[in-house]
Amino acid sequence: MRYLQNKKNNLPANNTEEIISHPLETDIEANQAKLEALLEHCSDAVFREFVIGKQPPIRCLLLYFDGLVQRKMLDDNIIKSLLLDVQMTDNPKSEFEQGDLLTAVEQNIINVAELKRIATLQEVIRHISSGDTVLLIDGCSQALVAGTRGWESRSINTPENELVIYGPKEGFIENLRSNTALIRRRLKSSNFKIESMVIGKITQTDVVLCYIDNIAPPQLVDEVRKRLQMIDIDAVLDSNYIQELIMEHKSTIFSQAEQTEKPDRAAAHLVFP
């Protein structure tokens, strides 16, 4: 398993709107390259590569967003079934015609209540952004979508300092991945980027930089990223440490940054900066 990190690929970064309209191909490598281009700088995107069968092995790819899925359902009903049940068949392509391989997996292997097929990259992005898991199989021009939605709900606190009468009552908690999932649920776009980094020599605190690729000014994103990477400090115990260190004019009476406990407000600021 690997999380998609900041990496180079063979597809132009500014061509995502054109890429997302493409249908899925039978070549799993081509599909993966396009999805990695669309999800570049999305550190919560998980690409799980594996093979099924033995003679010959068939390449597969699971794709989901960490924090949006029920991990137990994913592990027990999808990954375990694919890695154990299918491996007992030496040659799945001979047992099922290649065109029916997806049907065989759909009907006999994956054990979830919600399961359907999709055929475009745009559908892949939309479903994983909603908490579903997508399975791509080499040689198949369609993908399977498994309903694995299962994010934090009632354990997420009501904001104490930003009380509202109307609208969502959810507030951020101390778990970073749960917090990014709260924003990801509201911004179901491949242009919403989450870049991960670690700050603090002793605390090794996980920090994420969130922005919408075609809305946030690139020079602003680059400057914030640069200032975060230049922070040299022993401990980061709360967000005030970060805010103080990246501000340009520390003595000004004018606000240079806002803090919020509400994911809907954070999402709104990303969409309408």
What are these language model-derived features?
Residues M1-P273:
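Membrane-embedded alpha-helical signal segments
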